[in-house]
């Protein structure tokens, strides 16, 4: 189900971002799939930004569900996914709601769309290794109100809504408004003040 939610205040996201900037040195994956912001920090920012979505999907029991897509048999993809879900698991609630994290290999756009629709997936996180299938993921989720998040900064310009980068030792959030509109994910305009816009 999709329900209207009450957005958090912008100062609350500023506070989360300030705390996240105190994180450890970045984790890295090889090549053009580089992860520059540690998954623990990504988890904090993901949870904070998701709480601003005003039409977020929820599971039938009202829980926030985060689907983490990995590339099958890819060690870096699996490592980042497990680090992210471990950090999310340490959070008691997201949006003041219970939450669940699921790790699954990407099995095609049709299967992804069905999974999100049947389970009421709130967020799809795309782990390193899946850069080549980003157009398929974006197309599969058009109009779904699912928030897509990329573990790699370059994923934002290639089809996810939210991503993270490290610039001069500071974490930045990247946001793709064009993709946000394509997915029918609603956010207040004020949130863009804290983002680097990438389209």
Predicted regions and their residues:
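Short hydrophobic alpha-helices and adjacent helix-cap/hinge residues
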Residues: 2-5, 17, 23-199
């Amino acid at each position: 189900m999709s329900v209207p939610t009450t957005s958090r205040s912008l100062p609350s996201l500023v506070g989360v971002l300030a705390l996240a900037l105190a994180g450890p040195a970045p984790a890295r994956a090889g090549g053009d799939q580089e992860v520059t912001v540690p998954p623990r920090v990504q988890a904090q920012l993901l949870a904070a930004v998701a709480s601003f979505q005003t039409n977020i999907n929820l599971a039938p029991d009202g829980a926030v569900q985060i689907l983490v897509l990995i590339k099958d048999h890819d060690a870096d993809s699996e490592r980042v996914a497990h680090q992210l879900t471990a950090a999310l698991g340490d959070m008691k609630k997201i949006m003041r709601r219970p939450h669940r994290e699921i790790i699954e290999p990407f099995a095609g756009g049709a299967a992804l769309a069905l999974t999100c629709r049947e389970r009421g997936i709130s967020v799809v996180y795309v782990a390193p290794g899946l850069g080549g299938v980003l157009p398929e993921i974006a197309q599969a989720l058009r109009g779904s109100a699912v928030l897509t998040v990329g573990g790699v900064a370059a994923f934002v310009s290639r089809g996810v809504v939210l991503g993270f980068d490290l610039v001069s030792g500071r974490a930045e959030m990247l946001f793709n408004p064009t993709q946000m509109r394509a997915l029918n994910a609603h956010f207040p305009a004020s949130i863009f003040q804290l983002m680097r816009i990438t389209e």
